[in-house]
Every structure is written in structure tokens, then in C-alpha cells.
Amino acid sequence: MAFPQPRPQAPQLPQHLWRTVDCQQGAVRAVRFNADGNYLLTCGSDKSLKLWSVSRGTLLKTYSGHGYEVLDADGSYDNSQLCSCSSDKTVILWDVASGQVTRKLRGHAGKVNCVQFNEEATVMLSGSIDGTVRCWDTRSRRMEPIQILDESQDGISSLKVSEHELLTGSVDGRVRRYDLRMGQLQVDYIGSPITCVCFSRDGQCTLSSSLDSTVRLLDKSTGEMLGEYSGHVNKGYKLDCCLTDKDTHVLSCSEDGHVYYWDLVEGSLTLKLPVGKAVVQSLSFHPTEPRLLTSMEGRVQVWGAEPEDAAENES
């Protein structure tokens, strides 16, 4: 006789506040998990980049070298390097251990909104209000980009790299997907200025948020709209969106002090997580666990799917 299949467990959503970190670096413009989720990066309006332990909420290192507020950052897969970008028009490559600037790259004509390593951390990609994405070789000493992508009609607000693909979101209302290996470009017209883009974890879809207070899920290869998610407020700020670690839910920051969770398939609002009374500007989802980082004003919140003492007892 056949045993009935076990029912799949309902996905766990981070909704229990584990800790709040007072970052003491002005407004936190972006918060990011590192590649393995053990550390977090905060980008401050006071020109600093900070590295923290997620489990303890303790400050490990401060990186100083930008001339104006830091807007985005990323960590290399082996945790040896960081990259960051700033309103000072520069991109900086950092040595994690020493805290020293390895390279400071100039070339953008305006503030740099977003930066990310490729998978091997051999290339940094930066997107700017000047409408270009610049690709920088992290291993060479040359100060010029190895490639400039200038198809956007307005500023680049967000970019994500996955293997040989690059996804960009622009104020011109378009999501662009570059196949860097094949030299191909696919453009999806959304219409409203894009604030954030990302790939789904399975690589089949793209997610974008825009200033019409809507998050959209598109089929990556066809551009077909698979889902629209709304209810949050995104009218004046560059806010983050993302998918959970298992692609079951769509998340977005909101200007009303909440993080919104929608069921990816149903499109229905699953959870409206109260963070505080101000704008939730940035979020980051753990690569493998149901954990979430949010930033509001000068603080970062770490959220888990269950109360922290219960999680510690299990581990």
C-alpha cells in the first residue's frame, strides 16, 4: 500500500523581530546580506560602509573612503572583498580584512545608485543616474571600465547580476535584460520609473517595483506578465523588492512603515509586517533561511520566522 505524500509545509515568513541595530551612520540607505548570510552591510548617509555580525548585531568594521553618502554595496562570494557606490560618483573596491581601499573608480557623470559583483567577483557592475552601467575588472589595475552599457534613456536605479545575465531597472520605465555572453538585449516596458529589479531564485522570472506602487513579476524569456502585487506605497522613494529564499512570496518595502508579503502565485497579501513609523527604505532576504533585514532611518531590523530563542533551541 502506498503511503500518502506528506503535505508540504507552509513556508515560514520572517515576522518576529530578533534585534534592532542602531547603526550610527546617519540614514541607512541600503542594507545587504553577504553571500552566506552570516554578515550584513549597511550603507550610511554619513559616507561610511559598515560590516556587522547578523547573529550578534555587533559592528565588525567600518569602511571610510567615500566623499558623500553610500547608496549600495555588495560582498564577494569568498567574503574577501566588498564593493560600494556613492553619491560622490565613485565605486570603491575594499579589502574586507584590512578595511583599506583597494581601488577607487571614477567615470560616472552622476551619483552611482547600485553596484554588484558578478559571481566570481572578477567584475563589478555599477549603475548611475547618468544612465550608464559600467563594468570594471577587479583584477586589473586599469581605471577604465571594460564595458559601458548606455541603452537607458534615463538614470539606472537598480541592477542585478546572475551568471552571464544582467538585469537593470531605469527611471525611463524599462527593465532591460542583457545576455552578456551572447551580446543580446531584451527590453520590457513597464511605464513607471523602476525603483528595484531582481531575478527569481529559480532564474525563470524577473521582479520589478516602480513608482506607481506596483510590483510586477515577468516571465524572463517572454516578458509575459505573471503577477501584479499592490497595496503598499511607493511614490517618491527608491525602495527595494525581492523574493523569499524559496520563491514562494514577493516582498516590498513601503513608505507607510511596513513590509508587504504577497503570495507569488495567488497575488494575495499574506502579511503586512509593521516595522515602524517612517519609510522602510531597504530590505534583504537571507540566501537560504527565512530571515529578513530591513532598514528604517538610522536603524536596521533583523527578522526571523520564529522567536529567536526558539530558533536557538533548534540549532
UniProtKB/Swiss-Prot annotation:
Please tell me where this protein is predominantly located: cytoplasm
Q: Which domain of life is it from?
A: Eukaryota
Give yes or no: UniProt keyword Oxidoreductase: no
Give one Pfam hit by family name: WD40
Subcellular localization(s) per the UniProt record: Cytoplasm
UniProt cross-references to SUPFAM superfamilies, sorted A to Z: WD40 repeat-like
WD repeat copies, ranges: 23-62, 65-104, 107-146, 151-188, 189-228, 233-272, 275-313
Q: Does the keyword Repeat apply?
A: yes
UniProt-listed GO biological process terms: mRNA splicing, via spliceosome
Q: Which UniProt keywords apply?
A: Cytoplasm, Repeat, WD repeat
* GO CC terms of this entry: catalytic step 2 spliceosome; cytoplasm
What CDD domains does the entry give? Answer: WD40 (cd00200)
Question: Its biological function?
Answer: Molecular scaffold protein for various multimeric protein complexes. Acts as a module in the assembly of a multicomponent scaffold for the ERK pathway, linking ERK responses to specific agonists. Also involved in response to hypoxia by acting as a negative regulator of HIF1A/HIF-1-alpha.
Family designation: Belongs to the WD repeat MORG1 family.
Indicate what this protein is called per its UniProt record: WD repeat domain-containing protein 83
Q: Which organism is it from?
A: Danio rerio (Zebrafish)
